[in-house]
Amino acid sequence: MTQSDFFSLDGISKRFGVVQALDNVSIAFRPGEVLALVGENGAGKSTMMRILEGVSGPDTGTVRHGSTPIVFGEPRDSHRAGIRVIHQEPEIVPNLTVAENIFVGELPRLAGVLLDWRKLEEQTDRVLATFGMQQDMRPRQLCGTLGPAQRQMIEIMRAIRAGGRLIAFDEPTSSLTDDEARRLFSVVRRLREKGTSIIYISHRLNEIIDLADRIVVLRDGRLVDDSPAAGASEQTIAKLMVGRNIDDLFTRETWRSGEQLLDVAGLTTDRVNDVSLRVRRGEVLGIAGLMGAGRSELAKAIVGYDRRIAGTIAMNGVPVLPNSPHAAIVAGIGFAPEDRKHEALLLFRSILDNAALCVPDKTSSFGFFNRRKAMEIVSPLAAKMSIKAPNLDEQVSKLSGGNQQKVVLARWLARQPMLLILDEPTRGIDIGAKAEIYRLIDELAASGIGIILISSEMPELIGLADRVLVMAGGRITAELARPDIDEATILKHAMPQSASSPGDYIQ
């Protein structure tokens, strides 16, 4: 390995208006090494990726290959240099085939005109065989029929086939099952063995410790640590990310819950089978289970998104009309869905518009939106939740994942619900934003609001919930109360009957 093999950033700075996104950052990306890039949302990770991709250039500083400065006028220049970024949401064309997506831009043609399908299929079969994907997809299969893990693999295969020498993975496991994530880790390790430089970005610190050779920490646009991964702990990484101790992520006491609030009896949908549950005021009820257990479907049935086949729902003893999200809102139920980008937010509207969405009765005058009234409601909520944005007119699509989630929560706080259902509320957000959301859950429960917390993160359920219901196959298989809420017990009841051991499903 020589200096000429390295990609590096040398004194990179980038400013957007008053925000210093990167401040004199220098990093070397070595062949055959997995470099984990961590930091809170807004630390500068995305800006660094945009510079490496050629989407935007640095204000000062240099991108180098070996000792040679390289300038990217557009993403194509970055690709030619051998740099590829595998985004959290894979960039594939759903109405094109697997083969066309893998070889996009370099499709073999007959006489320079007609697509040479025979040659394309042969080339694609070789690529699929190299990655052991022959059973997962076919060359002529439309990519719109593939799942998230398969679409991600297409991006990886495209990057390697095109000669990718530095490959960045941006939150690659955010939408993968445990088995799919393990498969991805194997691919990353194989790439490392072949001498590829890897940048791995993730908020899941356990993944970082497991995969990385070196960990680089960004905070407020500055590089604050660049150290070997050996010996690192989640606690030390988190402290470097946020600049303070966060040992007490879960500070919740077991609050004295009040009278019964929600009563669900015999609820049945296409994916939920005869579920009954109760939630009291001030109680945090956790819902645990593996992917496909029916947790999200249960939440959507309660709030009227999914069609109710049988069963009843009542708030404060008053029946809630079936299949009506509006009826659920009127009854005092708020819902923050797992897929906030597609199911909760108007991405190209402002923070103000999104946060005021559920209180039209308080933000309108004579049938028209009243900005002054909306500002009076939303401004204190944005301040309370520390939403990081220049102002409330900022487009939600420009916010980090943590701040987008805060906007969703602010919307429901404006509505002042009696019950709030949170489906994977901390998925894809950094450790600092997680701590803020945990504190908010504490405060809401202490104020008497009932919380249903659906989470795949065991520490959240163990640290926040008063009771945990475990689901498998659309049914509730166990109810656990403190002090009997622990990971082993949850996993035992979450396993389908066919599972031989927890290792078959959970890493």
Curated annotation (Swiss-Prot):
PROSITE patterns: ABC_TRANSPORTER_1, ABC_TRANSPORTER_2, RBSA
GO cellular component: plasma membrane
EC identifiers of the protein: 7.5.2.7
Recorded name of the encoding gene: rbsA2
Official protein name in the record: Ribose import ATP-binding protein RbsA 2
Originating organism: Mesorhizobium japonicum (strain LMG 29417 / CECT 9101 / MAFF 303099)
GO molecular function, one term: ABC-type D-ribose transporter activity
Database matches in InterPro entries: AAA+_ATPase (IPR003593), ABC_carbohydrate_import_ATPase (IPR050107), ABC_transporter-like_ATP-bd (IPR003439), ABC_transporter-like_CS (IPR017871), P-loop_NTPase (IPR027417)
SMART domains: AAA (SM00382)
Membrane-protein topology: Peripheral membrane protein
CDD domains (alphabetical): ABC_Carb_Monos_I, ABC_Carb_Monos_II
